[in-house]
Amino acid sequence: MNISLNTCILILKEHHLLKSSAVQDTVQTIMEAVSYDSRDVQNNSLFFCKGAGFRPTYLTMAKENGAIAYVAEQPYPEGTGMHALIVRNVSKAMALLSAAFYSFPQDDLFLVGFTGTKGKTTSAYFLKGMLDQLNGGRTALLSSVDNILGPAPEDTFKSSLTTPESLDLFRDMRRAVDNGMTHMVMEVSSQAYKKSRVFGLTYDLGFFLNISPDHIGVNEHPNFEDYLHCKLQLLVNSRKCIINAETDRFADVYAAATTTTNPDSIYLFARDGFENPDLKKPIDFRYKSVETDLAETKFTLTTASSKAHKLPISGEYTLQMIGDFNETNATGAIIGAGLAGMSYEDCAKGIRHVTIPGRMETVTTQKHGLIVVDYAHNKASMLALMRFMRREFTTPRVIVVVGAPGDKGISRRPGFSESLTAEADKAYLTTDDPGFENAQDICEEIDAGIDHSKCETVIELDREKAIKEAISEAGPDDVVLLCGKGADAFQKIRGVDTPYAGDIVIARQVIQELEK
């Protein structure tokens, strides 16, 4: 892979990003690597000066390590002697130039994006499971749990961001294409659009699942409207759109989709019986629960419009994942599979055995009730999880172990307090990626918003100890919910990923000790 300085200049001019350029010798200079991390720079590299924490010393280090050109929003004396491309927006420039450097791998992939406050990961895994039936296992995945870029073990690895930085994204796409992948399913976060990580990408299918206040704070979105605006950009940049008609702010969501997509290519779905008098458009697909228990979920999907009838996906589906809320996630994914050319038979077969690390994983016990590990990490997902458990159990005592991350998602904390007050009998407030904040302060902030006449609380910062205490006190008819971390095998503490056994591993160890 390589890119010439001349090509960079032409691309930046085409998108009206180039403010000025300083070419040292010839525009035909070839760069053989690209990087935004000075520690990873190789000889003949193009270096991007980006990020709120960028320091000129990083450019000095990049130059010493072999960078011959840099892209930045202002010139730096540290770059003297290097080719300089000064741009209006370095994040957008990095996305465009990275795509070109990796020879536009998106053009060789059927590209699918999911956005929403909750359900992105589950929906993405459901769709991958089905598409693998279509293409023989050649579906790449970029999610907040795992990235899967090929069939070999080394092609599957833990993700660090829901949506990678643009340079990493296009590198991953190129790797997927070179590995024979034909489809890519990815979660698209609001930050991906706010920080231009997916700038220039057009998706074959774009999904909008739901929206509720989240990711609002100093380091994220200044307010809900900014959060919503960034979420909506996926629909603006998709050829076909699939929308949950039950979402809040539906009128805004649908309007965003129609700015670039013909209504004939916009598909709506909702639960059977859902009616919204303000909904001016017909719902295309309906789904209805058949049977939900603590082993599997069954539901039916029916077509309800002329364009929906063209997709042969109606029928009964079985999920190995519990939770009636997963019917919503599955329905959207099935519609996507139908639009990708799949039939009911292949969809039903592909989705039936999908499981997701850290999503609705259960541990059954003899004397300590049901233990559930789930990534539920905001008010909406917490409420959905606890309410499902109360419907499934006659008179359960719901015990929750949960914390809130530091340095981000500050707006989630009141939501935790409200959901625990509404549905939990007892909550163990504990550590969950505190970052540079004090975990005790985070827990006390959540605790201050809880009505203790409805929900008893204990603050135990040692997450492993909190899990052990919660399980130990649970009776045979109780439910213990371990929320927020899912399958994470680390705690983010003061900039370091500190090893952590994982909620499901700890839960199994505790039960083994208690019931041996």
UniProtKB/Swiss-Prot annotation:
It comes from Lactobacillus delbrueckii subsp. bulgaricus (strain ATCC 11842 / DSM 20081 / BCRC 10696 / JCM 1002 / NBRC 13953 / NCIMB 11778 / NCTC 12712 / WDCM 00102 / Lb 14). The gene is murE. The keyword DNA-binding does not apply. Catalyzes the addition of an amino acid to the nucleotide precursor UDP-N-acetylmuramoyl-L-alanyl-D-glutamate (UMAG) in the biosynthesis of bacterial cell-wall peptidoglycan. InterPro entries: Mur-like_cat_sf, Mur_ligase_C, Mur_ligase_C_dom_sf, Mur_ligase_cen, MurE/MurF_N, UDP-N-AcMur-Glu-dNH2Pim_ligase. ATP binds at residues 116-122. This is UDP-N-acetylmuramyl-tripeptide synthetase. Transmembrane segments: none annotated. NCBIfam families: murE, PRK00139.2-1, PRK00139.2-4. It is found in: Cytoplasm. Pathway: Cell wall biogenesis; peptidoglycan biosynthesis. One of its GO terms (cellular component) is cytoplasm. Carboxylation is probably crucial for Mg(2+) binding and, consequently, for the gamma-phosphate positioning of ATP. The keyword ATP-binding applies. Belongs to the MurCDEF family. MurE subfamily. Its EC number is 6.3.2.-. Keywords: ATP-binding, Cell cycle, Cell division, Cell shape, Cell wall biogenesis/degradation, Cytoplasm, Ligase, Nucleotide-binding, Peptidoglycan synthesis. GO terms for molecular function: acid-amino acid ligase activity; ATP binding; magnesium ion binding. UDP-N-acetyl-alpha-D-muramoyl-L-alanyl-D-glutamate binds at residues 38, 162-163, 189, 197. GO terms for biological process: cell division; cell wall organization; peptidoglycan biosynthetic process; regulation of cell shape. It comes from the Bacteria. The modification N6-carboxylysine is found at residue 231.
